[in-house]
């Protein structure tokens, strides 16, 4: 992750599930779920190379936010039409669509450069539609990614990991409370 240029930006990324019967297409609320399905990757980290900038379409006068980022190698292949949701800095959640995806090397695990834009903030209708069309939810774990492990965790695994983290903190606190000697400022061997 440290070898890929850009600033870290945590997003909830909706990657299109493409098969022989469905092609790459932008998200449309009017399309049924069987014709457009997604895999949600929560807490995914994009490496921003061009920060979000306000731009205006001269013909329509409509404002849009545009930017560019890198997708780290070994994660997934981004497609034009993928969408993601993330904070845009003013407390609002932006609804972004990938407008360009380019593989940057011939290697199997390559960095992908993406460009994205938005013309609106997320809305309850968009969230509801994306939720209906989501067939798989994964969590991105940057620690697993850094150590070359499978970077995705399923929802049930994430719940177990959260419980283990909480249990570890409770155990650590109890251990120090029971075996720490205040007088000598050290741990006493049990």
Where are these regions (language model features)?
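Interface-prone segments of viral and bacterial extracellular assemblies
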Residues: 1-190
């Amino acid at each position: 992750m440290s070898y890929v240029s850009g600033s870290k930006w945590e997003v909830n990324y909706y990657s299109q599930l493409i098969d022989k019967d469905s092609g790459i297409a932008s998200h449309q609320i009017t399309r049924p779920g069987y014709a457009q399905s997604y895999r949600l990757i929560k807490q995914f980290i994009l490496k921003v190379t061009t920060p979000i900038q306000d731009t205006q379409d001269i013909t329509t006068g409509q404002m849009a936010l545009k930017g560019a980022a890198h997708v780290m190698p070994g994660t997934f292949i981004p497609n034009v039409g993928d969408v993601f949701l993330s904070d845009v800095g003013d407390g609002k959640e932006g609804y972004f669509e990938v407008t360009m995806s380019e593989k940057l090397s011939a290697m199997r695990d390559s960095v992908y450069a993406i460009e994205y834009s938005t013309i609106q903030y997320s809305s309850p209708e968009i969230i509801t539609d994306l939720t209906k069309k989501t067939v798989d939810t994964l969590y991105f774990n940057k620690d697993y990614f850094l150590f070359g492990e499978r970077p995705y965790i399923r929802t049930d695994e994430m719940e177990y990991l959260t419980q283990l983290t909480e249990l570890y903190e409770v155990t650590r606190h109890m251990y120090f409370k029971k075996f720490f000697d205040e007088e000598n400022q050290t741990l006493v061997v049990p």
